Swiss-Prot record:
The keyword Metal-binding applies. Belongs to the GTP cyclohydrolase I type 2/NIF3 family. The keyword Membrane does not apply. A divalent metal cation 1 binds at H64, D102, E223. This is GTP cyclohydrolase 1 type 2 homolog. GO terms for molecular function: metal ion binding. One of its GO terms (cellular component) is cytoplasm. The lineage of its organism: Bacteria, Pseudomonadati, Chlamydiota, Chlamydiia, Chlamydiales. NCBIfam families: YbgI_SA1388 (TIGR00486). Keywords: Metal-binding. Transmembrane segments: none annotated. Homohexamer. A divalent metal cation 2 binds at H65, H219, E223. It comes from the Bacteria.
Length: 251
């Protein structure tokens, strides 16, 4: 298998052409004809992750957050230069899939959580098209027990909570990463709790004034789910050497 073959497998799974994304999906740095020897999968192509990929002798790094985003300046200097330099001098091909890995119903950052936790009557959720998140229902549970359940699942503490809603809940909506503004969409769809990664000052007032529960578990914690699932998928389809790199980032 070469990188072009791997890209075909990933594109057939994730359908990146359906998304108006914030950056390019697919090969960002490298040679499409390079052979795939070992794939490292991670959340973000930061320098710490790149160094881990080098240390484990990977020649492909597959991430959720790549190097390039809309509106970035063109010069390749500073932090971006350092990251690219380490990739190129170690012959590591960088592949990134952003929104497609959030939205996927099997290996995505959102649907995978809902299915693993046994939510039922699952539907797409979110104000974007295609929708990135998921909503569902479950047996009634106290909100504090629900927080504990999610903390155990994500292996991360809740970073922020605004409990403006019911003390016992039976429905939730989830969009991983930086989606706290979707709390209003969650209220409009009459769910009891909205879960995301990031939070900001308005979320507190919104949760209490809209009478909904809001939970934030960190951008990184909520977006490890998809890369981990993608690691297992690649093993199942015949990629012999694939590892998930868990770089520390509590945000």
């Amino acid at each position: 298998m070469n990188v072009a073959d791997l890209l075909h497998v990933l594109n057939e799974l994730l359908y990146p052409e359906l998304f108006n994304d914030y950056g390019p999906n697919g090969l960002q740095v490298g040679d499409a004809q390079a052979p795939v020897r070992k794939i490292a999968v991670a959340v973000t192509a930061d320098l710490a992750t790149i160094e881990k990929a080098i240390a484990c002798e990977s020649n492909v790094l597959l991430v959720h957050h790549g190097l390039f985003w809309k509106g970035m300046p063109y010069p390749i200097t500073g932090m971006l230069y350092q990251r690219m330099q380490r990739l190129i001098e170690n012959n590591i091909q960088l592949i990134a899939y952003h929104l497609p890995l959030d939205a996927h119903p099997e290996v995505g950052n959102n649907w995978k959580v809902a299915k693993d936790l046994g939510w039922e009557r699952l539907e797409s959720f979110g104000s974007t098209k295609p929708s990135l998140g998921v909503k569902g229902v479950f047996p009634e549970i106290g909100i504090h027990d629900f927080v504990s359940q999610l903390s155990s699942y994500y292996q991360a503490p809740v970073l922020a909570k605004a409990l403006g809603g019911k003390e016992s809940i039976s429905s939730a909506a989830l969009i991983s990463g930086g989606a706290y503004k979707e709390i209003s969409e969650a209220k409009s769809q009459e769910v009891d709790c909205f879960i995301t990664g990031n939070f900001d000052e308005p979320a507190w007032s919104l949760a209490h004034e809209l009478a909904i529960n809001f939970l934030a578990f960190g951008h990184t914690a909520t977006e490890k789910v998809g890369p981990k699932a993608l690691t297992q998928y690649l093993k199942q389809v015949g990629c012999d050497s694939v590892v998930f790199l868990d770089t520390e980032n509590p945000f």
